[in-house]
Swiss-Prot record:
Domain of life: Bacteria
Annotated protein name in UniProt: UPF0741 protein Sca_0247
Compositionally biased region (Basic and acidic residues): 67-105
Keywords: Coiled coil
Region feature Disordered, mapped onto this chain: 67-114
Species, as recorded: Staphylococcus carnosus (strain TM300)
Length: 114
């Protein structure tokens, strides 16, 4: 089964370019998805990546890579990965819904002020 890494290009603590290079070096065959992962709270303070739908975070990129290596050595459970994938999708959906509502609210405020 191919590994999958999800990394954020928006969070303050994540250096997307260097993290992507390190992950590619670790597993050249892995799928890497870059974009908002709706993991903003931890992403402000720690660098993180989702490894096969499991979130991993650390204070430094090197510490994170150690955790990623350990995670890749563990046996994979397809049912658990599917459960985590669904949870991640739901988290992203909720964030998108919140963002949409906030934009609508701001647009209404602009209309009432005009």
């Amino acid at each position: 089964m191919q590994n999958k890494f999800l990394i954020c290009d928006d969070c303050q603590a994540v250096n997307c370019k260097s993290l992507e290079r390190k992950l590619k070096k670790l597993d050249p065959e892995a799928e890497i998805e870059i974009g908002c992962q709706s993991y903003c709270g931890p992403g402000r303070r720690k660098t993180f990546a989702f490894v096969n739908n499991r979130p991993l975070a650390a204070l430094t990129e090197d510490e994170l890579m150690e955790k990623v290596e350990k995670q890749l050595q563990k046996p994979r459970d397809p049912e658990e990965e599917e459960r985590l994938r669904k949870r991640n999708e739901e988290r992203k959906r909720r964030k998108e819904e919140q963002d949409r509502k906030l934009k609508e609210k701001l647009a209404k405020r602009k209309q009432t002020k005009a």
